[in-house]
Amino acid sequence: MNRTISALKEWLNPDWARHRSVPPFEAGLRPNRRLDEGTTLLPEAQFEPDDVVIRDTGEVVFSSGDGIFTLTDGVVTRVVTLGGQVGSLLVAEDRMIAAVEGVGLVTIDADGVATDLCTDAELAACVTDLTLLPDGIVLATIGSRAVPDWSAALVADDRSGRIVRVDGSHAEVVAEGLGWPGGIENAGAGEVLVSLGFDHRVERRAVTALGKAGAAVGSNLPVYPGRIATCTDGWWVAAPYARNRFTELLLDEPDLLREMTATIRQDQWFVPRLRCPDPYTDTLQLGQLRVHGVIKPWTPPRSYGLVFRIDQRGRIAESVHSRADSDRHGITGVASRDGRIVVAARGFRNLLEPQKDNER
């Protein structure tokens, strides 16, 4: 009914039409080349890091495939192999907590011994992020309960995402009906930051009222925000995907969307990706402009590399980019300690330490 009314209003007066728009990268999100000029930390194409954390000792720990690895002085060591794809990581004192697809939450002690923490069905799939509260409670975001694949959930406008409270082996759903909550982080004062990917929004919610909509910290972002990590002067937010006008147009047309999903294989859908290995064969090339075979950095990206920092006042203070003409894309995790930043570029299949100069 709403769709019919909208179509009728647009027919009567085109100026009444309301369509999705993509805001520009500006102010704190002004494009730069800090990821492109940063340092790669892993051997090329040997890993596909999903998340990363930095311990108090400065040791870098990351997840890739079914394992957890450490990186010390350029040497990568496998810590443990788990029973499924390892995603989000969390440091909790002298142990680690990992989300394992098909299993749930697993703890890994200092000796690398893994023990099941919570194997509740709510945590068995699509855990996107974890955070630890001061009282020892773990909060987990579930991207989707019904459609655990990101691109399929996007075109379905899925709203089955949840926040789950984990106390030992007990799990309790404390928020539901969310549009792909991709990140959560303790913000102090009894609050957490939550990123809502399909709403292009980061918001602050009270721990005692996680089921209620919170105050926007960043809204109508030009990206789909993901995992969040605390730093000394705010929070870093990973943005695995950037929005583009082609996809937004598609999402405004349900009939066209249904035809696409029914007639085109999923890897060719006109939606953002973590990486775009051969952009020259992309259908319609998403409107990208090429001169002499060169992709321009300002073109509509199918894949993009970005993390941005929100300061204590809730403003986007800085960001690091890898633009459309590069390949250091698909940033799924970020960690910061003592001024050092390390990002997990799953699309690029490496860990990156961004260039420090924000003017580049």
What are these model-predicted stretches?
Residues 37-44, 74-81, 113-120, 170-175, ...:
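A short beta-strand motif characteristic of beta-propeller blades
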Residues 71-75, 109-113, 166-170, 206-210, ...:
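Short loop/turn segments that connect beta-strands within beta-propeller blades
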Residues 62-63, 98-99, 139-141, 193-195, ...:
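Residue position within the beta-strands of beta-propeller blades
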Residues 99-133, 140-161, 175:
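Asp-box/WD-like beta-propeller blade repeats and closely related beta-sheet repeat scaffolds
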Residues 7-8, 18-48, 73-75, 306-323:
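A short helix->beta-strand "capping" segment at the edge of beta-propeller domains
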Residues 45-55, 83-95, 122-137, 145-146, ...:
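Beta-rich, blade/repeat-based domains predominating
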